[in-house]
């Protein structure tokens, strides 16, 4: 086969993908963290951690499309999660190429590309995001039809069990390639019951990010219009899991918008919880900390006994909040932001504890069956995620917390263990890497891809071609749920550069773009927390010229259409190229 291994002993592939996993949490690979994760730690100690690993489009579905195809979003056609065309399953992907090379291929868990999976001998995937409890799976049925079935249990455990079953029942005469797609730690975060109390204790030892109350000065104006604020955009119910029925009127009136409060009064929410003061002045009232989102919350798919466990836990959370509020401990916006951040961390990190157990279970299975020496294990998140840095949750931006993603690779005897690589790598690189180690890296296959194989990094974690490689990024989903602008750009070892295509409302009215809103340049060496846009700083004029030249070179190399990602109400029409 190719350059890595003889054709008589082709390696297996176990590709584990989580959803919205911040690489900052890979710090839990270290033994002295407040929240130890032995599965992640073992994987890091036995494999290589890539500290400068980036996505190409920080959204769940598009990132997965980039991994499958080895191509950027505009060249695989899947630009955003919803509202556009489904992933075109007829295009070249590495699972199809592995199939053709004699591999048995499968996927369990999250797919999130709308279309029916292709390139797999078997699949059991969520119809969309999946639910934390009793999720629905779909698989191929008679006459090529998709059939659905609901499984009972916690989603991470179910996906892990399906992965083990798939490996148990595979054709043992063939090498295998299995994708394990976990829902966790995607919103809305519901840890397994066994982790609720432990994670609360862990989070009590954590300190909020020092940028939690960022005012977004000195950066493009769109950051101030972003709708992913921990303080203002997290829902009290669906995200923070407060129990509405336990919050009395004197507290509730400060944490929801006035329109939502009126609706609660009309529905009699406070009837058995102190009622509403007869002299309450609706006209004069202005809530202190009104969450903009007030949709329902996700305990709907649980069995009654399971729901009771969560209700007991979240009842306690709500009771403690009401007591703190009435005791005057929630006076400022920072006070409220820290509380919402702490609830967020309890739930987000709690979901990762089950993923950690899944990793241990899967690695133990490989050990027991003599597969560890000849199986490449890849662990990735589909992108990064804000954990309160700059006051945000979610992703979408070219800023570091969103753009950078976890990547760990383990292949015993082939990949140096315990190394933290500083190479500049991207998720479009996984497909060509997998093809090379499988001996399927024919010119016909590799020529469809824009990524490069990472095998030169396997020995030491470093190679000249990866030292300061510029990594292209593009985000298309505008208008969208969180109001992030369309933008594209790239990251080098030192600089983050972007062209923000979407004008602000004022710029759209005037027809004039302000340079500080249109262009972004961050000097990550001098400004590692990315607090200052120096695009218009005269001291960086020459750097800006260099960055714009690299930007246009990258757009040319990757055949980005001239008007893409565009600045109008719709994405420009263009034909993906592969």
Locations of the language-model features?
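Formylglycine-dependent sulfatase
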Residues: 1-519, 528-549, 553-556, 562-578
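Residues forming the ATP-binding cleft of Hanks-type serine/threonine protein kinase domains
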Residues: 525
């Amino acid at each position: 086969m190719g350059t890595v291994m003889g054709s008589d002993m082709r390696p297996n592939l176990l590709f584990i993908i989580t959803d919205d996993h911040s690489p900052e949490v890979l710090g839990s690979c270290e033994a002295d963290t407040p929240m130890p994760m032995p599965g992640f730690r073992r994987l890091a100690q036995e494999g290589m951690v890539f500290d400068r690993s980036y996505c190409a489009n920080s959204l769940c579905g598009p990132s997965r499309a980039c991994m499958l195809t080895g191509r950027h979003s505009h060249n695989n056609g899947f630009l955003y999660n919803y509202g556009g065309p489904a992933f075109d399953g007829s295009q070249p992907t590495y699972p199809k190429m592995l199939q053709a090379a004699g591999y048995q291929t499968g996927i369990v868990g999250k797919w999130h590309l709308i279309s029916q999976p292709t390139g797999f001998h078997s699949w059991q995937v969520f119809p969309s995001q999946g639910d934390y409890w009793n999720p629905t799976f779909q698989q191929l049925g008679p006459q090529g039809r998709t059939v659905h079935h609901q499984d009972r249990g916690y989603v991470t455990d179910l996906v892990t069990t399906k992965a083990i079953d798939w490996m148990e029942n595979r054709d043992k005469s063939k090498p295998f390639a299995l994708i394990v797609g976990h829902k966790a730690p995607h919103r809305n975060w519901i840890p397994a019951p066994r982790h609720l109390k432990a994670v609360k204790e862990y989070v009590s030892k954590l300190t909020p990010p020092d940028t939690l109350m960022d005012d977004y000065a000195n950066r493009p104006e769109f950051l101030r219009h972003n709708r992913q604020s921990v303080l203002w955009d997290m829902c009290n119910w669906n995200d923070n899991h407060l129990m509405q029925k336990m919050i009395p009127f004197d507290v509730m009136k400060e944490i929801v918008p006035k329109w939502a409060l009126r609706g609660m009064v009309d529905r009699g929410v406070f009837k058995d919880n102190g009622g509403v003061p007869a002299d309450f002045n609706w006209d004069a009232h202005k809530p202190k900390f009104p969450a903009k989102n007030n949709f329902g919350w996700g305990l709907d798919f649980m069995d009654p006994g399971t729901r009771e466990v969560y209700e007991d836990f979240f009842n306690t959370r709500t009771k403690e909040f009401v007591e703190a509020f009435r005791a005057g401990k929630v006076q400022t916006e920072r006070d409220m932001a820290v509380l919402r951040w702490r609830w967020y961390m309890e739930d987000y990190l709690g979901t990762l504890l089950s993923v950690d157990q899944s990793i241990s279970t899967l690695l133990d299975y490989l050990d027991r069956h003599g597969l560890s020496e000849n199986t490449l294990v890849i662990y990735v998140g589909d992108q990064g995620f804000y954990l309160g840095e700059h006051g945000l949750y979610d992703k979408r931006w070219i800023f570091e917390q969103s753009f950078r993603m976890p990547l760990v690779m383990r292949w015993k005897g082939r990949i140096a263990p315990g190394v933290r690589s500083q190479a500049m790598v991207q998720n479009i690189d996984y497909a060509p890497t997998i093809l090379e180690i499988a001996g399927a890296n024919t010119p016909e296959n590799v020529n469809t891809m824009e990524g490069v194989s990472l095998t030169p990094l396997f020995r030491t974690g470093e190679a000249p071609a990866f030292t300061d490689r510029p990594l292209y990024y593009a985000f298309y989903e505008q208008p969208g749920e969180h109001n992030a602008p369309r933008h594209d750009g790239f990251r080098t070892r030192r600089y983050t550069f972007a062209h923000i295509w979407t004008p602000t409302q004022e710029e759209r009215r005037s027809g004039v773009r302000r340079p500080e809103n249109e262009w972004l340049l961050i000097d990550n060496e001098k400004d590692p927390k990315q607090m200052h846009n120096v695009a218009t700083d005269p001291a960086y004029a020459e750097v800006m010229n260099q960055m714009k030249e690299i930007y246009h070179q990258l757009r040319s190399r990757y055949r980005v259409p001239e008007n893409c990602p565009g600045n109008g109400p719709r994405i420009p029409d263009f034909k993906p190229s592969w």
